[in-house]
């Protein structure tokens, strides 16, 4: 008899909202213009890579946990930046998805795009 492998629960992948699709397109256009950035489709999202390292995923048809969220990866997150992330109400630092390497940023309006881009830039800088 085979031992049953324990699986991590899959993150919820709701449909991306229409607003989020527009915001993702705008953010994606900006990220695609950065040096060494390549994109690949990934489970209803578009993954953004700096060279071979993935640093972000933006919704195309699906989102992670929330219809208005994007995810970015900073591994390891420097302590000062982690403290800043913990103070940011739009970033979920408790339930990082999927796994501890990813952070979820929730957008509520176009005013959030500037801050989302700042965090995406941090992820890009740390993906060297």
Name these PLM-found stretches.
Residues 1-5, 21, 57-59, 96-98:
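Short amphipathic alpha-helical segments, especially helix-boundary/capping motifs
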Residues 41-96:
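Short, conserved beta-strand/beta-arch hydrophobic-aromatic motifs that form part
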Residues 19-26, 58-75, 114-128:
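Short, Lys/Arg-enriched charge-dense amphipathic segments
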Residues 14-18, 107-110:
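Charge-dense, low-complexity intrinsically disordered segments
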Residues 1-15:
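Polybasic, lysine-enriched low-complexity intrinsically disordered terminal tails
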Residues 74-128:
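Short, structured beta-strand-loop surface elements
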Residues 10, 30-31, 95, 102:
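Generic signal for short, ordered secondary-structure residues
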Residues 15-54:
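N-terminal first-folded block
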């Amino acid at each position: 008899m085979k031992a049953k492998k324990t699986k991590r629960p899959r993150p919820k992948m709701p449909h991306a909202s229409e607003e989020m699709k527009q915001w993702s397109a705008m953010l994606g256009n900006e990220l695609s213009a950065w040096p060494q950035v390549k994109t690949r489709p990934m489970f209803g999202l578009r993954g953004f890579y700096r060279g071979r390292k993935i640093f972000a995923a933006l919704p195309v048809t699906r989102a992670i946990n929330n219809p208005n969220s994007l995810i970015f990866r900073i591994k390891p997150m420097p302590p000062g930046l982690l403290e800043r992330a913990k103070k940011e109400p739009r970033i979920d630092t408790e339930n990082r998805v999927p796994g501890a390497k990813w952070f979820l940023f929730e957008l509520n309006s176009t005013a959030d795009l500037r801050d989302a881009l700042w965090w995406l830039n941090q992820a890009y800088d740390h993906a060297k």
